[in-house]
Curated annotation (Swiss-Prot):
Gene3D superfamilies in the cross-refs: 1.20.5.3310
Protein name: Sec-independent protein translocase protein TatB
Subcellular location: Cell inner membrane
GO biological process, alphabetically ordered: protein transport by the Tat complex
Taxonomic superkingdom: Bacteria
This protein's GO CC annotations: TAT protein transport complex
Principal localisation: membrane
Record keywords, A-Z: Cell inner membrane, Cell membrane, Membrane, Protein transport, Translocation, Transmembrane, Transmembrane helix, Transport
MF terms in GO: protein transmembrane transporter activity
Coiled coil: none
Ranges that cross the membrane: 1-21
Organism for this UniProt entry: Cupriavidus pinatubonensis (strain JMP 134 / LMG 1197) (Cupriavidus necator (strain JMP 134))
Family designation: Belongs to the TatB family.
């Protein structure tokens, strides 16, 4: 930026004192300081935005490079798998696996799979709550019945200290 030393600042201050006058100099100095601060903040914001854009562009380039590398690896794997499958089929004498067993691999469904699909991985709330023993629930203060705060106070207040209401 501009190289301003102590001597140059003193010279600028003396000229401003003579030109502007001692009454208006503090107000002008505050205004100039505020404008300089605003300009510095704006410059810092622009620098940060430019650096973010540069980093974003670098990340985009890296992402495309990684995606290309992943596609290359995937192609290589598929190529090797198809070559090995072809070599295995040739070694077995060209027998088709689906013709031999009467169906493909997708026709085989294990017995646990159908039971698992029935629940879709979810247990009912009652099953989860019933899984804990009652002594554990009592020891860890697991609530069995939902009560309001007033109902809990009434339940645990000693009988002698209860206030009688007009309607009881």
């Amino acid at each position: 930026m501009i190289d301003l030393g102590i001597s140059k600042l003193a010279l600028i201050g003396a000229v401003a004192l003579i030109v502007i006058g001692p009454e208006r100099l503090p107000r002008v100095a505050r205004t100039v300081g505020a404008l300089v601060g605003r300009a510095q903040r704006y410059i810092n914001d622009v620098k940060a935005e430019v650096s973010r854009e540069v980093e974003l562009e670098e990340l985009r380039k890296m992402r495309t490079e990684f995606e290309d590398a992943a596609r290359d690896v995937e192609r290589t794997i598929h190529k090797e798998v198809s070559e090995q499958t072809q070599a295995l089929n040739e070694a077995l004498g060209g027998i088709e696996p689906s013709a031999e067993s009467g169906g493909g691999v997708s026709d085989f469904v294990p017995s646990w799979h159908s039971a698992h699909k029935a629940h879709n991985g979810r247990k009912s709330w009652r099953v989860k709550q019933g899984a804990r023993p009652l002594w554990f629930k009592r020891q860890n203060n697991v609530r069995v019945w939902v009560q309001s705060g007033a109902a809990r106070v009434k339940r645990h207040r000693p009988a002698a200290g209860r206030a009688r209401s007009f309607f009881e």
